[in-house]
Amino acid sequence: MTDQVLAEQRIGQNTEVTLHFALRLENGDTVDSTFDKAPATFKVGDGNLLPGFEAALFGFKAGDKRTLQILPENAFGQPNPQNVQIIPRSQFQNMDLSEGLLVIFNDAANTELPGVVKAFDDAQVTIDFNHPLAGKTLTFDVEIIDVKAL
């Protein structure tokens, strides 16, 4: 009888990963976390994770705990000035506006487009359609629970 040592499955293509994560901003604010609830499970390459975050996980195995920094270019990108629009105030009748208010618009294909009110006056409203985390360096604390080959 021979002893076989099975290599621990590492994160890579054709794997399913279960992990806990906490997403923090540079100022330390936690944006999202699974540590106080059920862990997240995903298949590598399924598009559910930021590509930069997913790539940073490659090579990790169950039991690994790491802190990863993801630069804006590998996360939500830099803010695009063309995603800031000025809209006539008349399109917001009967709406109580405030800076920071999230407003949902529908495009021609009826897809929801969230935007944040950046400024407003009696004539116009400035809406920022950039992702709220655009331009931010993200920190992920991760604990790998399980890695399975698919």
From Swiss-Prot:
It catalyses: [protein]-peptidylproline (omega=180) = [protein]-peptidylproline (omega=0). Keywords: Isomerase, Rotamase. Its EC number is 5.2.1.8. NCBIfam families: PRK15095.1. InterPro entries: PPIase_dom_sf, PPIase_FKBP_dom, SlpA/SlyD-like_ins_sf. PROSITE patterns: FKBP_PPIASE. Residues 14-88 form the PPIase FKBP-type domain. GO terms for molecular function: peptidyl-prolyl cis-trans isomerase activity. It comes from the Bacteria. The gene is yaaD. The keyword Isomerase applies. GO terms for biological process: protein folding. This is Probable FKBP-type 16 kDa peptidyl-prolyl cis-trans isomerase. Belongs to the FKBP-type PPIase family. PPIases accelerate the folding of proteins.
